[in-house]
């Protein structure tokens, strides 16, 4: 039985078979955890779905791990700042409502 996608096709997308296994496992775990798929799949199993994504080029190994970490840190920092801004707005709204209540009494 011929497996699709073929190992030869997949090895054109990644530097080594070891990298392929790691990339497939990580992506399969992401799919199992509920990550959004990048395409529609022929396969039912998440491991084969990951291989389909690798074959299509939708999932790749990041060429610069330091840049990837920096991008993740920047995203986390942006999310933190957005949360802080939201909390500040809520506190201002609460203070404004308390002030309005004090004027009514």
Swiss-Prot record:
It is an enzyme of class 2 (transferase). Promotes RNA polymerase assembly. Latches the N- and C-terminal regions of the beta' subunit thereby facilitating its interaction with the beta and alpha subunits. PANTHER family: DNA-DIRECTED RNA POLYMERASE SUBUNIT OMEGA. GO terms for cellular component: DNA-directed RNA polymerase complex. Disulfide bonds: none annotated. The RNAP catalytic core consists of 2 alpha, 1 beta, 1 beta' and 1 omega subunit. When a sigma factor is associated with the core the holoenzyme is formed, which can initiate transcription. Belongs to the RNA polymerase subunit omega family. InterPro entries: DNA-dir_RNA_pol_omega (IPR003716), Pol_omega/Rpo6/RPB6 (IPR006110), RPB6/omega-like_sf (IPR036161). Gene3D superfamilies: 3.90.940.10. This is DNA-directed RNA polymerase subunit omega. GO terms for molecular function: DNA binding; DNA-directed RNA polymerase activity. The gene is rpoZ. NCBIfam families: rpoZ. SUPFAM superfamilies: RPB6/omega subunit-like. It comes from Streptococcus equi subsp. equi (strain 4047). Keywords: DNA-directed RNA polymerase, Nucleotidyltransferase, Transcription, Transferase. Its EC number is 2.7.7.6. GO terms for biological process: DNA-templated transcription. It catalyses: RNA(n) + a ribonucleoside 5'-triphosphate = RNA(n+1) + diphosphate. SMART domains: RNA_pol_Rpb6 (SM01409).
